[in-house]
């Protein structure tokens, strides 16, 4: 199974001049008519597993900068194909920067460079018009100062998600080891699974630990993988001095393949500057047209700087 390790043959998304002006200005010779081309085979995420979790990622596009000016956003398609080529009007040595991009909250219209993946930088890239210069497969990693507030990959028997008092069922590990339903990789042999049945049709669970609030404006991201035939709601339980506030963030749609999602927690938590801490909550009810449901999740991370 491949998820986020190779992404090929993307299309060029043109940006408005106003966006370029807002992010920097790249100056080039207006008389140049023949572009230089670079080809990219894909982008891999490299992690130090004990501290950063698995290397699952869903890098859907790249943000390309020349001399700190945004050139454009180049989208990877769903299917694998030949290495992609991008035209750039540049000649000679320039700084080339490639930032890995994601779909924020899983929405195609909210694409952003992921702030916790390091950009790939070539300080003096020699652009040669009329040629294709192959960069091959690129590799990114988390910034060294990224903080991992929560890591749950279900590889240990103890699970850091506890059932709510009203829940009919609990999340458990897939069995046996390397069950084909699980998210399988070099560091992943198990996943978390929630089974709903007609007589056990409601699930609720929260992270065992509470997480400290950060300075308002801090970008706090929840990463996770999922595969499900039943809707799963993700939210936060926010505790302040007097009350606990439950706030839904989004609903995960059905998917018969493993998907990766990046959820912006910070924008929601910043609405409660007096809050003390928060937990992540998971909720699901058996859909009326189903006799049973199978909800799988894995590689949960809370990350911030």
Residue ranges and their predicted role:
Residues 286-303:
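Extracellular carbohydrate recognition
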Residues 103-137:
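Structured interaction patches on ligand/partner-binding surfaces of diverse proteins
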Residues 136-170, 294-295:
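Extracellular carbohydrate-recognition regions
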Residues 169-205:
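Short carbohydrate-recognition loop motifs
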Residues 90-109:
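A short, solvent-exposed beta-strand micro-motif common in secreted/extracellular proteins
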Residues 242-275, 290-291:
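Extracellular carbohydrate recognition and processing domains
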Residues 21-24:
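C-terminal motif of bacterial Sec signal peptides marking the signal peptidase cleavage site
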Residues 154, 207-232, 263, 300:
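Extra-cytoplasmic beta-strand recognition segments
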């Amino acid at each position: 199974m491949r998820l986020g390790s190779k992404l090929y043959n993307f299309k060029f998304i043109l940006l408005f001049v106003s966006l370029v002006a807002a992010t920097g200005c790249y100056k080039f010779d207006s008389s140049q008519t023949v572009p230089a081309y670079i080809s990219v085979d894909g982008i891999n995420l490299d992690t130090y597993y004990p501290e950063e979790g698995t290397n699952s990622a869903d890098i859907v596009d790249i943000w390309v900068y020349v001399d700190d000016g945004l050139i454009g956003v180049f989208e990877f398609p769903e299917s694998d194909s030949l290495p992609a080529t991008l035209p750039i009007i540049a000649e000679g040595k320039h700084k080339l920067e490639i930032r890995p991009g994601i779909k924020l909250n899983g929405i195609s219209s909210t694409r952003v460079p992921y702030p916790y993946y390091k950009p790939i930088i070539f300080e003096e890239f020699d652009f040669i018009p009329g040629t294709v210069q192959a960069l091959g497969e690129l590799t990114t990693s988390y910034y060294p100062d990224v903080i991992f507030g929560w890591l749950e990959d279900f590889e240990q028997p103890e699970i850091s998600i506890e059932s709510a008092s009203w829940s009919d069922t609990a999340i458990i590990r897939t069995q046996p080891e390397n069950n084909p339903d699980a998210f399988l990789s070099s560091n992943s042999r198990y996943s978390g699974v929630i089974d709903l049945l007609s007589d056990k049709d409601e699930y609720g669970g929260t992270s065992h630990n509470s997480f400290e609030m950060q300075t308002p404006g801090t970008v706090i991201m929840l990463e996770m993988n999922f595969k499900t035939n039943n809707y799963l709601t993700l939210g936060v339980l926010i505790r302040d001095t007097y009350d606990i506030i439950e706030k839904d963030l989004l609903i995960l749609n059905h998917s018969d393949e493993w998907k990766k999602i990046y959820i912006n927690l910070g924008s929601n938590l910043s609405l409660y500057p007096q809050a003390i801490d928060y937990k992540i909550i998971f909720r699901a009810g058996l859909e009326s047209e189903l006799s049973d449901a199978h909800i799988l999740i894995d590689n949960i991370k809370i990350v911030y700087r």
